[in-house]
Amino acid sequence: MNRASKAQELFNQGYACSQAVILAFSDLIDIDSEKLSKLVLPLGGGLGRLRLTCGAINSMSMVIGILFSNSESNEENKNNTYAIVQELVNRFIEENKTINCAELLKQAELEVQIGGKAEERTSEYYKKRPCGKIVYSVAKILEEFLKEKEVI
């Protein structure tokens, strides 16, 4: 199974968008999966259901940071990492038009609720939500990039 399908499967099992993406790449990260899952959960729903930057995009950025940056505080490190994130975000925008959670939901003609509690994951939820496809798209872009860079 490719990582994009794995991410979509994880989302369909009830994980947040942010968790699904990072867990699909967890074997590449020197942090155990349980900690990764906890670390990125607040990013789901566009940062705690505030419908800002898509949680899947945020987790993709974290994978890039872990794999391509270092702990040094210098401009070269920052600029190299930022350039990769910008490239991958632009690839996502080409396919999906935006990285904003609210806008992605509106494209699916859904009413956008900001804040509040997570919705119950029912079959109806999965039918109407674009999130599984979005998680797949983010993970596919990241997977392709990592293959280009011969990381996987």
Predicted region positions:
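Polybasic, low-complexity association/targeting segments
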Residues: 1-13
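Acidic-glycine-rich active-site phosphate/pyrophosphate-binding loop
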Residues: 24-42, 111-116
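Phosphate-handling active-site elements
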Residues: 29-38, 66-87
